[in-house]
């Protein structure tokens, strides 16, 4: 499925992420979250939930009859004058694109944002064949200009300041921008955008080939749909004489009615907009009478492991994804460790459930555990992908050894987990444990936080504080109101039992963390 075969070391990769990146990530995703909440509220919650259910139904039905829709799509594209190519895996997809480019003597390529191109590692193959590939998405263009000087975690360029981008443009493009490296205020975004636009327009006009993706493919008409905000995708698709479109087979939509539903959902959750700046419909190459569009259009339909998921309920529900990335924006894990930690082109919750199924659990067995199971991704997903259900399903397979990497679990961990389950399943023990923890935490308490616990918990609090343990809110409320509805306080014997349980759990947890620290657990 991919040239990558080494197991993904999520823990090791995330440990390398600089602390300042997390704050920048949260700030960037919070802005999108606020916009999303506003447009969804304006849509109306009841109507929104109905639209989500409709979107899910469209995606599930499409996947159940995917072969029929793809056959219809191929016939429609061919009838419109386009060429359809089928790629079983990443290697065959790269070969197809290289053969098309070489047959047309291509030396310069302009590329819009395409996760599929990254998935099949196409850019490196094109460069190895002597072709120049220019990223035209503004963020990707900045990252490409910076090259190896940019920390690998800063992808895309959302975490770079305006001043950093201005300095980069001065050095790489040789342009004069008002103000020096220490100028305050930094150059306006419009100034930087105009500089990039000037360079990119010249590249569009000189390019031999445009390389794009597509958000959807309408089977009944053979129409390719591209949803963007920058307009670079439209330029890549209309100015060069040759266009190659890379699309996973799962992005097909049966008809225009289904597309209308999905276009209602996608921009609202992806960018917090009712509709993006550009929605482009591509229907075959240009006719002789048209003044724009490619003279030749090639569509590469890529499987790369997706078809094997169709026979499994969890696989189909995963493939419902319409690639909005809303799950990334709300995920506390992604916002802390960034995308590079996931070790694959698709990070965040969707990467955590898709990579193990596409790449195999032997490669991505760590990713199902890269989640707090908070469920925020479930709530925000426009097509109601059940992330936590799929994550738990994949975790059970890893524990059962289906991926060839069953984790080594020490008896101490088993004992600690068993004791924790007993406490959490008993109201009496839980209340007693909470009261015990509230007392035991006193030496390390600073306000509402535990900022510096002793080993082995010191490893956790060295990175982030823990909230203090408090007794149940309802019990405290009734105590203040002198309400006896909760019954008599715990007996001394029960309190003693609860304290003992709490101490056993704490001891088990400490031993488990100690084992992990020594690399045993």
What are these regions (language model features)?
Residues 275-278, 409-415, 448-453:
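Short coil/turn segments at secondary-structure boundaries
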Residues 419-423, 432, 490-517:
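Hydrophobic alpha-helical topogenic segments used for membrane insertion/localization
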Residues 437-500:
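Short linear elements at protein peripheries
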Residues 251, 319-323:
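Short, contiguous, pocket-lining structural segments
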Residues 1-314:
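The feature marks the mature, well-folded catalytic cores of soluble enzymes
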Residues 92, 276-289, 323, 334-338, ...:
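A glycine-rich phosphate-binding loop feature that marks nucleotide/adenosyl-phosphate handling sites
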Residues 289-318, 328-329, 333-446, 485-486:
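Ferredoxin-type iron-sulfur electron-transfer modules in oxidoreductases and energy-metabolism complexes
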């Amino acid at each position: 499925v991919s040239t990558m075969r080494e197991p993904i070391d999520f823990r090791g990769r995330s440990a390398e992420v600089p602390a300042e990146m997390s704050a920048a990530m949260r700030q960037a995703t919070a802005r999108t979250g606020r916009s999303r909440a506003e447009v969804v509220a304006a849509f109306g919650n009841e109507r929104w939930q109905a639209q989500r259910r409709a979107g899910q139904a469209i995606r599930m039905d499409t996947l159940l009859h995917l072969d029929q829709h793809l056959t219809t799509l191929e016939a429609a594209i061919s009838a419109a004058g386009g060429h359809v190519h089928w790629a079983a895996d990443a290697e065959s997809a790269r070969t197809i694109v290289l053969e098309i480019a070489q047959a047309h003597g291509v030396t310069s390529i302009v590329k819009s944002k395409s996760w599929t191109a990254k998935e099949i590692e196409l850019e490196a193959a094109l460069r190895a064949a002597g072709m120049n590939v220019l990223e035209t998405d503004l963020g990707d263009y900045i990252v490409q200009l910076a090259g190896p000087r940019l920390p690998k975690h800063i992808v895309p360029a959302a975490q770079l300041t305006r001043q950093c981008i201005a300095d980069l443009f001065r050095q790489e493009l040789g342009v004069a921008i008002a103000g020096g490296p220490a100028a305050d205020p930094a150059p306006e975004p419009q100034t930087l955008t105009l500089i990039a636009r000037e360079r990119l327009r010249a590249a569009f006009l000189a390019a031999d080939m445009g390389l794009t993706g597509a958000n959807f493919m309408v089977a009944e008409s053979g129409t390719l749909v591209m949803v963007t905000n920058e307009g670079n995708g439209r330029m890549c698709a209309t100015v060069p004489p040759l266009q190659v479109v890379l699309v996973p087979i799962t992005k097909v939509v049966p008809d225009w009615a289904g597309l209308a539903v999905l276009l209602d959902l996608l921009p609202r959750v992806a960018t917090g907009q009712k509709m993006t700046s550009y929605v482009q419909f591509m229907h075959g190459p240009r006719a002789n009478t048209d003044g724009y569009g490619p003279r030749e259009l090639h569509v590469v339909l890529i499987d790369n492991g997706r078809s094997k998921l169709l026979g499994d309920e969890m696989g189909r529900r995963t493939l419902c994804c319409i690639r909005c990335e809303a799950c990334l924006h709300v995920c506390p894990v992604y916002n802390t460790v960034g995308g590079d930690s996931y070790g694959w082109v698709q990070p965040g919750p969707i990467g955590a459930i898709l990579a193990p199924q596409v790449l195999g659990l032997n490669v991505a067995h760590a990713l199902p555990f890269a989640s707090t199971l908070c469920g925020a991704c479930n709530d925000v997903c426009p097509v109601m992908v059940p992330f936590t259900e799929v994550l738990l399903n994949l975790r059970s397979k890893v524990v059962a050894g289906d991926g060839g990497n069953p984790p080594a679990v020490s008896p101490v961990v088993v004992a600690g987990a068993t004791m924790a389950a007993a406490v959490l399943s008993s109201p009496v023990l839980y209340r007693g444990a909470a009261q015990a923890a509230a007392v035991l935490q006193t030496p390390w308490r600073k306000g509402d936080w535990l900022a510096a616990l002793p080993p082995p918990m010191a490893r956790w609090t060295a990175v982030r504080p823990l909230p203090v343990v408090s007794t149940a809110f309802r019990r405290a409320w009734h105590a203040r109101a002198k309400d006896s509805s909760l019954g008599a306080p715990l007996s001394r014997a029960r309190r003693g039992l609860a304290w003992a349980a709490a101490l056993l759990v704490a001891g088990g947890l400490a031993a488990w963390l100690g084992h992990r620290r020594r690399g045993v657990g």
